[in-house]
């Protein structure tokens, strides 16, 4: 069995009752450091405004005497904790269950399955800032209910040769995504992820899990003085951000370019393009039949490319995202490249298109409402015998956040969200659409 860690949309939908996975962050430590309110950097935390994005792109620096840690008060501690106590309800409308509970021989039937209760998604910790002027860092451990992981850890050299266009980062980091997964406003199980960032067709054996995962590598990035023009080019190990060199010895390349401009009557707008180009092994060297980590062979190519826009109209902002994906025929059919005879007749590399539209209504800094529609459509299946809609999905998400507290010391949001996902043909017995719903109410606070 291959060593891998990826999310196929049908597996997410079946498994989304098990865990709360999104992780996003605002960092009140920066507000304490500079004496600024959270709203200086956040349109609605954890979502950044243009000033916050510029501050982040500058390596968490304002360009004044407070940037270097040697000028900070000894009592300043650049650490943030984020916790989300909640109540949530999860529904699977076509769960396979025994016809007679406890009887494995009674046969399986589809039934609606519900569970609900109070829960805790874990504790997000972040320490970030500057080690010295123009040397930035970021470390993000996550304490889950059953594990502790290091979500991100990187160091960055800023303004090389005195130019804001030359910055270098190394470590495990979030890719410069078109719209940040880490800063998503939604936390519920069904609508808390941008699935088009993570999609892999059913039956595909690509080790790459999607641009939504932090990756291990090095990044060259830069921006204009007002942050209206930005670029990022990253070379990352082909291991989906997993430490320990578990796959092969190749590298993937990710690039993102965007440009903002002023539109009459509406102000700042932003457009961009991105691409991820990589290779994934199709088999491993073995010992007694067991794969040896790091010995991946038979590499085959894949890519994800797309375009996006962020549009502002009065108190509304609208995120639009489009993606086009392709995996090699061996990856799509989970066939080792050294055994081409195992490919089914008429096999091809899977191709798909997806995207989402997300709308925010932000009448004031303490309140924001949102709605999102996301979809994916397969345009070519890897195996011609596979139903043409296998891998298609539609997701609807609505919610709001109210912020009674937003200070340089802490922030708290009351949130309510509802999301519904339809996975075409994924019902385990009838082959109908798999349907999952998630309702979440809770507090999201950091300090």
PLM feature segments, named:
Residues 35-45:
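The canonical Cys-X-X-Cys-His
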Residues 12-14, 24:
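Cleavable N-terminal signal peptides
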Residues 27-37:
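Sequence/structural segment immediately N-terminal to covalent heme-attachment motifs in c-type
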Residues 1-11:
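Bacterial N-terminal signal peptides that target proteins for export
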Residues 49, 79-91, 95-99, 111-241, ...:
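Outer membrane beta-barrel
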Residues 64-84:
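Short Fe-S-cluster ligation motifs
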Residues 154-157, 161, 265-447:
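Outer-membrane beta-barrel pore domains
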């Amino acid at each position: 069995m291959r060593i891998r860690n990826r999310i196929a949309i049908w597996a997410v939908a079946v498994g989304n009752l098990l865990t709360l996975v999104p992780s996003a962050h605002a960092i009140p430590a920066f507000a304490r450091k500079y004496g600024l309110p959270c709203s200086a950097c956040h349109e609605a935390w954890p979502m950044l405004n243009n000033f916050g994005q510029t501050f982040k792109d500058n390596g968490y620096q304002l360009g004044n005497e407070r940037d270097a840690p040697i000028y900070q008060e000894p009592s300043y501690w650049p650490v943030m904790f984020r916790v989300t106590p909640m109540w949530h309800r999860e529904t699977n409308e076509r769960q396979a269950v025994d016809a007679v509970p406890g009887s494995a021989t009674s046969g399986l039937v589809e039934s609606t399955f519900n569970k609900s209760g109070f829960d805790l998604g874990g504790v997000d910790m972040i320490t970030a800032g500057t080690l010295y002027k123009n040397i930035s860092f970021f470390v993000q451990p996550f304490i889950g209910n059953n594990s502790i992981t290091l979500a991100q850890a990187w160091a960055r050299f800023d303004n090389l040769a005195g130019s804001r266009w030359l910055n270098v980062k190394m470590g495990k980091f979030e890719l410069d995504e078109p719209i940040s997964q880490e800063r998503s406003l939604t936390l519920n199980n069904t609508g808390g992820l941008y699935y088009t960032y993570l999609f892999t067709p059913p039956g595909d054996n690509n080790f790459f899990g999607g641009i939504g995962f932090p990756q291990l590598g090095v990044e060259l990035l830069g921006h204009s003085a007002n942050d209206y023009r930005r670029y990022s080019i990253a070379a990352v190990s082909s291991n989906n951000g997993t430490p320990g060199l578990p796959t092969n010895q190749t590298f993937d390349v990710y690039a993102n370019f965007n440009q903002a401009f002023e539109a009459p009557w509406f102000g700042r707008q932003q457009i961009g393009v991105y691409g991820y180009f990589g290779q994934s092994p199709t088999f491993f060297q073995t010992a007694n039949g067991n794969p040896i980590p790091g010995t991946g062979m038979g590499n085959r190519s894949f890519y994800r490319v797309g375009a996006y826009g962020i549009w502002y109209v009065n108190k509304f902002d609208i995120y639009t995202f489009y993606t086009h994906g392709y995996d090699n025929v061996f990856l799509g059919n989970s066939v080792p490249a050294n055994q081409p005879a195992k490919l089914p007749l008429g096999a091809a590399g899977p191709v798909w298109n997806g995207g989402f539209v997300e709308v925010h209504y932000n009448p004031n800094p303490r309140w924001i409402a949102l709605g999102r529609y996301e979809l994916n459509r397969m345009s070519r299946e890897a195996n011609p015998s596979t139903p043409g809609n296998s891998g298609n999905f539609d997701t609807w998400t609505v919610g709001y956040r109210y912020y009674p507290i937003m200070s340089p010391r802490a922030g708290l949001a009351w949130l309510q969200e509802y999301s519904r996902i339809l996975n075409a043909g994924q019902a385990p017995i009838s082959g109908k659409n798999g349907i999952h719903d998630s309702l979440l109410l809770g507090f999201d606070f950091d300090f």
